[in-house]
Amino acid sequence: NPYKFGLIGSTDSHTSLASAEEKNFWGKYSNDSTPEIKDQDIIGDANNTGWSMSAGGLAGVWAKENTRDEIYAAFKRKEVYATTGPRIGVQVFAGWDLSDITYKNFQDLGYKLGVPMGGDLSSISKNSGPSFAIKVAKDPIGANLDRVQIVKGWIDRDGKSREKIYDVAWSDDRDFDSSGQLEPVGN
């Protein structure tokens, strides 16, 4: 696998803060970092106030416990993901037959029958390709999700990097158009 790495997000707020969440999000820039000046326009006539600008990237980590050791163990396993602003929940398992996984037994059977995101499938099934179990939750105060995609990356026989994007779940009763594309849901 040429792309064997995990991705996390971290803030891109220009305040020198290591992290931010709702209760301590000071703004994107140092000049909107206190409540007294948060309402002021900071760039020309644009209404770019601190409260209206999203927080930076966020790291999602599937740790067994909320301890330093378990969080770092999840980083090493690459059982992590990144999101920007919205607090989207994502968990993915891969295996050769995950058809018995349901919402209620998702984690138990995911770990038992497959490997979590960031893991390696130990052997190749000659009878079928891998299957995936994916659980996604939108931010409770955010917009509805448009779709879930899996991006398959590989190196071809000529040594060139390739990718294919698969739409695996989407909102509403949309269908693919004649070119095989799915129109965005829009907001």
What are the residue ranges of the model-derived segments?
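C-terminal functional module detector
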Residues: 1-187
